C-alpha cells in the first residue's frame, strides 16, 4: 500500500470523531493565567493547546510554516466546540487542528517520495513525521484522529531512518503481565557496542520527537540513544501510567545485556519534564544498571503535590495528566489526590541518599518545575549537579544547556 493510500485509508470519514478538547471532562477551575515555559511553550488567548514554538522549531519546523498552519485554523468558519477557541473545529476538515497539520505533513511526504537524493528524502520524511506528531498533539487517549496521525508519524519516521546517517533499529521489548512495547535504538557511525542514553520523554510528546537530541548532541560523541513511548501513548498505549511510572523503562534496562549494539555497562537515563520522574526513579531502583541520570525541567514533586502550583498550569496540561492517569471524567479534587501519589518525595524516594550521579537543569520561575525540585534531586545524589538555564535568548540557552548536559553525561559514560 502506498503512503498516500495509507493516509486516505486512515483518515477516511467513518463517523463524527470526538474533538480533542472534549475528551477530558474535568471541572474547570476558572480563568487561566498566562503561562510561558521553555519546554512547553505558552498559552495564547483563544487557543486550547499550548503553542510550543521553541520545541517545534528545535525539531526542524520553520517558524513561518507554524504561522501558516495557525492562520488556516484561525480563518476557518467551520463549527467549533467552543467558539472562543480556534483549535476546536469539529470533524476532520479544514480548520481542524489535526487536519491542517496532517495536510502540511502530506506536502512533505510527497516531497520525500519525489526526491531522488536519499539524504534529502530522509530529511523530508523526518519533517513529515514531526508535523504528524504536532497534528496528534497533545496525544490524549481516545483521540481517534490523533492516533491515526501518530501511525503516519511512525511510518514516516521509519522511512526517514532508512535514509539518514547512522543506523536505527526498531526493537520489541517484552513486559510481563501485558503487551510488548516498541522502541527505537539510534546508533552513530562506527562499530558497537555503544554507550547509550535511555530517553524518558515528556507526557505530551512521542518517542519520535527526540531525533534532534540524538543527531545534534549524542551522535557526534559516539553515543547511541534508545527511546520508548511513555505509558498510555504511541507504542506503549496499552499500558496505563501508574505510580510505578518507571515500570516500562525498567524492563527495557534489564533487557539491554541481550542487545548486542548497546554497551549495557555504560548506560545513562535522560528525563524531560515528567520523564524526569521516570529517570529519577530509575536512579534509585536500578542504580547498578545506570552510570548517570540527567533531568531537564523535572516534574517530580511540586506540581504533583502543590494545589497552588496546579492552579497555575494550563487546562490542556491538566487534561494531559488526567488522560495519562485514565481519569477522563474525574473531578479536579480526585485528580489532585491521585497526582500526589506520583510525587517521588511522597513515595519516600527523593530526600534519601542515592548513589547514582544526577544532574538537573531548570529555568527560574518555571510554572511546571520550580528550582526546589531540581535542588531536591541534586542534593539527594552522592554526585549531584545543579544547572540553571537562563530564559533569554531562549533558543540559544536551550542549546547551550543541552550541550552542558551532554558533556556531563559523556564524562560519566565514555
Curated annotation (Swiss-Prot):
* Keyword ATP-binding attributed: no
Catalytic reaction annotation: a carboxylic ester + H2O = an alcohol + a carboxylate + H(+)
**What residue stretch is flagged as signal peptide?**
none
- Keyword Ligase: yes or no? no
The record's EC number reads: 3.1.1.1
Instruction: State one Pfam family annotation.
Output: FrsA-like
Function according to Swiss-Prot or TrEMBL:
Catalyzes the hydrolysis of esters.
What protein name applies here?
Esterase FrsA
Question: Species name for this entry?
Answer: Escherichia coli O127:H6 (strain E2348/69 / EPEC)
**Lineage of the native species?**
Bacteria, Pseudomonadati, Pseudomonadota, Gammaproteobacteria, Enterobacterales
- What gene is this protein a product of? frsA
Amino acid at each position: 500500500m502506498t503512503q498516500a493510500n495509507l493516509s486516505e485509508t486512515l483518515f477516511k470519514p467513518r463517523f463524527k470523531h470526538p474533538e480533542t478538547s472534549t475528551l477530558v471532562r474535568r471541572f474547570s477551575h476558572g480563568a487561566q493565567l498566562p503561562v510561558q515555559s521553555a519546554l512547553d511553550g505558552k498559552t495564547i488567548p483563544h487557543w486550547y493547546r499550548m503553542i510550543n514554538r521553541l520545541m517545534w522549531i528545535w525539531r526542524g519546523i520553520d517558524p513561518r510554516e507554524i504561522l501558516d498552519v495557525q492562520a488556516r485554523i484561525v480563518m476557518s468558519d467551520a463549527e467549533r466546540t467552543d467558539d472562543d477557541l480556534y483549535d476546536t473545529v469539529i470533524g476532520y476538515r479544514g480548520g481542524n487542528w489535526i487536519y491542517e497539520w496532517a495536510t502540511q505533513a502530506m506536502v512533505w511526504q510527497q516531497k520525500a517520495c519525489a526526491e531522488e537524493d536519499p539524504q534529502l528524502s530522509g530529511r523530508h520524511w523526518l519533517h513529515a513525521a514531526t508535523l504528524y506528531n504536532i497534528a496528534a498533539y497533545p496525544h490524549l487517549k481516545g483521540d481517534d484522529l490523533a492516533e491515526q496521525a501518530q501511525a503516519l508519524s511512525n511510518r514516516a519516521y521509519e522511512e526517514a531512518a532508512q535514509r539518514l546517517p547512522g543506523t536505527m533499529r526498531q526493537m520489541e521489548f517484552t513486559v510481563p503481565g501485558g503487551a510488548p512495547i516498541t522502541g527505537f535504538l539510534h546508533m552513530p557511525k562506527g562499530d558497537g557496542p555503544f554507550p547509550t542514553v535511555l530517553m524518558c520523554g515528556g507526557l505530551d510528546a512521542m518517542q519520535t520527537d527526540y531525533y534532534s537530541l540524538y543527531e545534534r548532541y549524542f551522535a557526534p560523541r559516539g553515543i547511541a540513544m534508545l527511546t520508548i513511548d511513555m505509558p498510555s501513548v504511541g507504542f506503549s498505549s496499552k499500558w496505563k501510567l501508574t505510580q510505578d511510572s518507571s515500570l516500562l523503562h525498567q524492563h527495557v534496562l534489564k533487557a539491554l545485556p541481550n542487545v548486542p549494539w548497546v554497551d549495557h555497562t555504560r548506560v545513562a537515563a535522560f528525563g524531560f519534564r515528567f520523564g524526569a520522574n521516570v529517570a529519577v526513579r530509575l536512579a534509585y531502583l536500578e542504580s547498578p544498571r545506570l552510570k548517570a541520570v540527567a533531568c531537564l525541567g523535572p516534574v517530580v514533586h511540586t506540581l504533583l503535590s502543590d494545589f497552588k502550583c496546579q492552579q497555575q498550569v494550563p487546562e490542556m496540561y491538566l487534561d494531559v495528566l488526567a488522560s495519562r492517569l485514565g481519569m477522563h471524567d474525574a473531578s479536579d479534587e480526585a485528580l489532585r489526590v491521585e497526582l500526589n501519589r506520583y510525587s517521588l518525595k511522597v513515595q519516600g524516594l527523593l530526600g534519601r541518599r542515592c548513589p547514582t550521579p544526577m544532574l538537573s537543569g531548570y529555568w527560574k520561575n518555571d510554572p511546571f518545575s520550580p528550582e526546589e525540585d531540581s535542588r531536591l534531586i541534586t542534593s539527594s545524589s552522592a554526585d549531584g549537579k545543579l544547572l540553571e538555564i537562563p530564559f533569554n535568548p531562549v533558543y540559544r540557552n536551550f542549546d547551550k544547556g543541552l550541550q552542558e548536559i551532554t558533556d556531563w553525561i559523556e564524562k560519566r559514560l565514555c
